[in-house]
Amino acid sequence: MAKKIIKLSFLIILVPLAVILGVVVFKDRSYAWVSLCVALFSLVPLFLTFEKKDTNTTKLVILAVMIALSVAGRFLFSFIPHFKPVTAMVVITGIYMGYEYGFICGAFTALISNFIFGQGPWTPFQMFAWGLIGLLAGLLAKVLQKNIIILLVFGALAGVLFSFLMDVWTTFWYDGTINFSRFIANIVTAIPVTIT
């Protein structure tokens, strides 16, 4: 139980803290370092899993394949506006491999695919958003596996959560501060994208 708390604290506390500190302290000038911190913090739970010998090479290969499929899916569907299968792949990884793997799949999909689409100050937010979706899918795996309707609702809400977290970045991007009315305006403006 203590290891699970440590793992979750890295993913739920340290990763968002790194993203927020990166935005507040470095503005948009050091996003590469913030992305590196997010990547390293997201690997700590996996390293702790190695310590228990719960991870084998088969799981690592499957994780690598899921990340590769997510990156390829994002690239192959890039010509279709507002449709990317990344969230679905991250949710599948979280449900069937565990929350640590789901977080890593989400975070590394954003990091690696942005080598194609362009790295920027939004990358740490994408890493955290997709990672959080994988983490939540892993934590709710038993419920999501039992009922297809709940899984479909979760998938839709995961897309909304991703958009919501990216709207936080958009609000920061304007002038480096959080302005609640601007944040609401960003959410309202993004509704056509969010519901697709």
Regions found by a protein language model. Name each.
Residues V71-T87, A107-A141:
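Interfacial aromatic-anchored transmembrane helix boundaries in multi-pass membrane proteins
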